[in-house]
């Protein structure tokens, strides 16, 4: 993946909750979350797995996507992920059946 990319990503936590975030290095950020060094929310919900990621040209765009996603209900979040999977707009997506 390009080093100048900005990503909005969604993690599936061990308790089946979803965590949304921003990063410019997906692999490093996922590793950080699973080492317990990431966000406080994910520390108690490990292990986490990547279930969705989208690439953006700017940090601002990625963070706006994260903000909009966080405003959705759980059902709408799952629909959003499924819609992106079908349209192939996402960099990485697990299907809701894989949650």
From Swiss-Prot:
Descriptive protein name: UPF0213 protein RBAM_000440
Organism (species): Bacillus velezensis (strain DSM 23117 / BGSC 10A6 / LMG 26770 / FZB42)
Residue stretches making up the GIY-YIG domain: 4-79
InterPro entries, alphabetized: GIY-YIG_endonuc, GIY-YIG_endonuc_sf, UPF0213_domain
Family statement: Belongs to the UPF0213 family.
Domain of life: Bacteria
PANTHER family from the UniProt entry: UPF0213 PROTEIN YHBQ
